[in-house]
Design a protein with these regions (language model features):
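RNA-interacting cores
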Residues: 1-214
Length: 214
């Protein structure tokens, strides 16, 4: 579970909601919340994290809820998609042969702007036209394939098909602004159904060139 902005202040409510959901069946059976750990998803040396809550604890333990972004500074960045990415055009999911740098980066930009508006009360002050032009200038190398992914919706009482593309994407000629959004996307994910965990990626150092991160 990744909480952004003001949602971080609702951690206790989220824990309670999970406890209640587990008691009233999640998926096809009941479960029990036994522990909550705080993990820094951007820490390459992360282990199991630090326990901040268990049912026998009266309060959520004090903990650092911040993460520090590492922004790529090299002239080539490669990412590896861990869960299916669903970019769409006119309501149709884009397969590997239809992916474009504009579709990828402008999806990241829009998501970042919306999160800022809902969590900080105002959208980011962005020049969307300029960012679109910078996206068009990026050289894209796609090494991806389609992966079907399904989940069961208890509310709709049916299986939902949420397939997307997985694999690697390499970007050349990235502007500084796009590098920032690429780093932010490590936490926000990219594409449709990101709230379900889709569109999650990591930096692939095997395909990175330049002097590392800022």
């Amino acid at each position: 579970l990744i909480l952004f902005g003001r949602a971080r202040d609702q951690l206790v409510l989220n824990i309670w909601a999970f406890q209640r959901a587990f008691r009233h069946e999640v998926g096809h059976g009941k479960a029990e919340l036994v522990s909550v750990h705080r993990v820094d998803l951007l820490d390459e040396n992360k282990t199991s994290g630090v326990q901040i809550f268990a049912p026998n604890m009266q309060y959520v333990a004090d903990h650092d809820a911040t993460s520090t972004l590492s922004i790529p500074s090299g002239d080539r960045v490669q990412i590896r998609m861990l869960t299916p990415m669903r970019l769409q055009q006119n309501g149709v999911p884009l397969g590997p042969d239809r992916l474009t740098s504009r579709a990828f980066f402008m999806t990241l930009v829009r998501r970042g702007s919306l999160l800022s508006m809902y969590q900080n009360g105002e959208p980011l002050n962005l020049d969307f036209k300029a960012l679109g032009e910078e996206s068009d200038a990026v050289r894209l190398n796609v090494s991806m394939g389609w992966k079907d992914w399904t989940r069961y919706s208890s509310r709709q009482k049916q299986t939902m098909s949420l397939g997307g593309v997985v694999g690697t994407l390499a970007f050349d000629n990235l502007s500084p602004a796009l590098r920032v959004f690429l780093a932010v996307g490590l936490l926000t994910h990219v594409g449709k159904n990101a709230s379900f965990g889709l569109g999650k990626y990591v930096f692939d150092k095997k395909g990175m060139k330049g002097d590392g991160v800022l």
